[in-house]
UniProtKB/Swiss-Prot annotation:
Reactions mediated catalytically: Hydrolysis of Ala-|-Gly bond in repressor LexA
GO biological process: DNA repair; DNA replication; negative regulation of DNA-templated transcription; proteolysis; SOS response
Family, per entry: Belongs to the peptidase S24 family.
Catalytic residues in the record: 159, 197
Protein name (record): LexA repressor
Transmembrane segments: none
Function description: Represses a number of genes involved in the response to DNA damage (SOS response), including recA and lexA. In the presence of single-stranded DNA, RecA interacts with LexA causing an autocatalytic cleavage which disrupts the DNA-binding part of LexA, leading to derepression of the SOS regulon and eventually DNA repair.
A GO term, aspect molecular function: DNA binding
Positions bearing the site annotation: Cleavage: 124-125
Entry keywords, A to Z: Autocatalytic cleavage, DNA damage, DNA repair, DNA replication, DNA-binding, Hydrolase, Repressor, SOS response, Transcription, Transcription regulation
Length: 239
């Protein structure tokens, strides 16, 4: 599965080579995807190369070859200037603006239960794009939420198992952009990928810490990470 940014870059390179026969420059790619620096382009190209979508040709400047396109090739994913992805975004279709989670809706006369929208999936592992589904709500105890706006995400991965969060669980998130050290947060990395991790500070940098010794703590500059909310509850279904 490619992230939206990876798909946008792949299609931009593909279309440019169809038009001119020459791959775009790193500056052109950076501008087309509205990234702040070329380092983000280097990371995207490396990811595409590792997944077998492109190949770098040796001993030639700006030499890239598109080997294949995604099975669900969608020209609408060509990058548009000014596109700003959110932590919740569509998978392969045209991106849709995502409204802030609506105020919780009581679902019982006694007010003991609240309906919360399930907004998609979140990685507890290597970051992936969260995928907006928003096809259903879940009902949670009102005392789980407290004040503020909330949404739910389905967990994919095992990097938070020592915190009691398992693959397939549903986490309840209080919407917000700040966190304290030790909070488990939804973190958006490089405006592209979302992950569920414990928030730490390492000097001026931000550390996203797993709760599984098989995963390394990842360190980022403060401008590369945006907090999208904090964990306040968890729901597990037993089948």
């Amino acid at each position: 599965m490619l992230t939206r940014k990876q798909q946008e870059l792949l299609l931009f390179i593909h279309e440019r080579m169809k038009e001119s026969g020459v791959p775009p420059s790193f500056d052109e790619m950076k501008d087309a995807l509205d990234l702040a620096s070329k380092s983000g382009i280097h990371r995207l190209i490396t990811a595409l190369e590792e997944r077998g979508f492109i190949r770098r040709l040796p001993n030639r400047a700006r030499a890239l070859e598109v080997i294949k396109l995604p099975e669900a090739y969608n020209p609408s994913l060509q990058p548009r200037r000014g596109f700003s992805p959110s932590v919740i975004e569509g998978s392969l279709g045209k991106p849709q603006p995502v409204a802030a989670p609506a105020a919780p809706k009581p679902v019982a006369d006694n007010g003991n239960s609240i309906s919360v929208p399930v907004m998609g999936r979140i990685a507890a592992g290597v970051p992936i794009s969260a995928i907006q589904n928003n096809t259903h709500d879940i009902v949670v105890p009102a005392d789980m939420l407290g004040s503020g706006e909330h949404y739910a995400l389905e967990v994919k991965g095992d990097s938070m198992i020592d915190a009691g969060i398992f693959d397939g669980d549903t986490v309840i998130i209080r919407n917000g952009s700040t966190a304290s050290p030790g909070d488990i947060v939804v973190a958006l990395v490089d405006d592209e990928e979302a992950t569920l991790k414990r928030f730490r500070r390492k000097g001026a940098s931000i550390a996203l810490e797993a709760a599984n010794p098989a995963y390394e703590t990842r360190i980022f500059g403060p401008d590369r990470v945006k907090v999208q909310g904090k964990l306040v509850g968890l729901i597990r279904r037993y089948h």
